[in-house]
């Protein structure tokens, strides 16, 4: 089952989520929106197993990265009709 990985613009570019992911789903890409000049990206979401280690590793109080498991994806992201 595929899971959606959403990275919010509150990301501080710390790389904690990238290092926590056991399947290398995430990577850092250039971004001018924070001091670190980088943001997490999820180019390989098809490999995500939904362990949410990236969420646990995120040091921001508002979880800059979220994993939405299967059916909760559209509902949680506000895409359901």
Swiss-Prot record:
Per its UniProt record, what NCBIfam families does this chain match?
PS_I_psaC
Q: Which HAMAP family does the entry mention?
A: PSI_PsaC
- According to its UniProt entry, what is the function of this protein? Apoprotein for the two 4Fe-4S centers FA and FB of photosystem I (PSI); essential for photochemical activity. FB is the terminal electron acceptor of PSI, donating electrons to ferredoxin. The C-terminus interacts with PsaA/B/D and helps assemble the protein into the PSI complex. Required for binding of PsaD and PsaE to PSI. PSI is a plastocyanin/cytochrome c6-ferredoxin oxidoreductase, converting photonic excitation into a charge separation, which transfers an electron from the donor P700 chlorophyll pair to the spectroscopically characterized acceptors A0, A1, FX, FA and FB in turn.
Q: How is the cofactor bound?
A: Binds 2 [4Fe-4S] clusters. Cluster 2 is most probably the spectroscopically characterized electron acceptor FA and cluster 1 is most probably FB.
Q: Which UniProt keywords apply?
A: 4Fe-4S, Electron transport, Iron, Iron-sulfur, Membrane, Metal-binding, Oxidoreductase, Photosynthesis, Photosystem I, Repeat, Thylakoid, Transport
Cofactor(s) demanded:
[4Fe-4S] cluster
* Chief location of this protein within or outside the cell: membrane
Q: Which Pfam families match?
A: Fer4_7
Q: Per the record's keyword annotation, is Electron transport included, yes or no?
A: yes
Q: Which GO terms describe its biological process?
A: photosynthetic electron transport in photosystem I
- GO molecular function list: 4 iron, 4 sulfur cluster binding; electron transfer activity; metal ion binding; oxidoreductase activity
Which residues does the annotation say bind [4Fe-4S] cluster 2? 21, 48, 51, 54
Q: What class of enzyme is it?
A: oxidoreductase
Which SUPFAM superfamilies is this protein grouped with? 4Fe-4S ferredoxins
* Subcellular compartments: Cellular thylakoid membrane
Name of the gene this protein is made from: psaC
Record PROSITE patterns = 4FE4S_FER_1, 4FE4S_FER_2
Binding positions for [4Fe-4S] cluster 1?
11, 14, 17, 58
Q: Does the keyword Oxidoreductase apply?
A: yes
Q: Which protein are we looking at?
A: Photosystem I iron-sulfur center
InterPro entries recorded: 4Fe4S_Fe-S-bd, 4Fe4S_Fe_S_CS, PSI_iron-sulfur_center, PSI_PsaC
Gene3D superfamilies, A to Z: 3.30.70.20
Instruction: Note the topology in the membrane.
Output: Peripheral membrane protein
């Amino acid at each position: 089952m595929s899971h959606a990985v959403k990275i919010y613009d509150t990301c501080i570019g710390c790389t904690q989520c990238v290092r926590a992911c056991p399947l290398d789903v995430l990577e850092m890409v250039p971004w001018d929106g924070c001091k670190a000049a980088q943001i997490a990206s999820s180019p390989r979401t098809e490999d995500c197993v939904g362990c949410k280690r990236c969420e646990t590793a995120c040091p921001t109080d508002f979880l800059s990265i979220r994993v939405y498991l299967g059916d909760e994806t559209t509902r949680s992201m506000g895409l359901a009709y």
